[in-house]
Amino acid sequence: MEKFKKAGKIASKVRKKAIKAVKGEMKILDLAEFIENEIEKMGAKPAFPCNISVNEITAHYSPPCNDDRKILPGDLVKIDIGVHVDGFIGDTATTVLVEGYEDLKNYNDELAEKNKKMIEAAESALENAINTIRDGVEIGKIGEVIENTINKFGFKPISNLTGHTIDRWVLHSGLSIPNVKGQNSHKL
């Protein structure tokens, strides 16, 4: 259990550093390399290639070594970080609205507000889901809480992305926690 905790703590620290590192005009690949280097500096290894998904790319994009695309002010950047310590995995993600869009002449303020609201919805859904988790709760109930929270913000959750259990050396093991109400009556 201690190595799971260590991996989780490193993932959390790296996530915080990644949030501060995201800048307009930065290459996606440079951000991925920064994140993976920070993981290694802290004595761990990446559990999977860092995922950096921009705007309409919802999740799981890892930039190839020749990717020269840049993150721009106003972009919505989703960062998914995996850390392992001897195969014990910590997995975390966050979403960042890249600063500097306020100075752009052609930037859509309405889109910026919608993106801020989307980040707030995701953070609230996560918090509500965590508060729902307890011994004996049905997995479908957790998904229902997530879906209801996101809907209250005027958004629809992505049904084919889930939370998941992790085991040593196995990133997606056993149970999946849906983002939507489901028929899963399996209990924690």
Swiss-Prot record:
GO CC terms of this entry: cytoplasm
An individual GO BP term: proteolysis
Complexes and interactors: Monomer.
Coiled coil (residue ranges): none
EC id: 3.4.11.18
Name the UniProt record assigns to this protein: Methionine aminopeptidase
Catalytic reaction equation(s): Release of N-terminal amino acids, preferentially methionine, from peptides and arylamides
Gene name of this polypeptide: map
Alphabetized PROSITE patterns for the sequence: MAP_2
Lineage: Archaea, Methanobacteriati, Methanobacteriota, Methanomada group, Methanobacteria
Binding-site residues for substrate, renumbered to this chain: 60, 172
Cofactors (names): Co(2+); Zn(2+); Mn(2+); Fe(2+)
Record family assignment: Belongs to the peptidase M24A family. Methionine aminopeptidase archaeal type 2 subfamily.
Gene3D superfamilies associated with the record: Creatinase/methionine aminopeptidase superfamily
Cofactor: binding details: Binds 2 divalent metal cations per subunit. Has a high-affinity and a low affinity metal-binding site. The true nature of the physiological cofactor is under debate. The enzyme is active with cobalt, zinc, manganese or divalent iron ions. Most likely, methionine aminopeptidases function as mononuclear Fe(2+)-metalloproteases under physiological conditions, and the catalytically relevant metal-binding site has been assigned to the histidine-containing high-affinity site.
Organism: Methanothermus fervidus
Keyword Hydrolase: yes
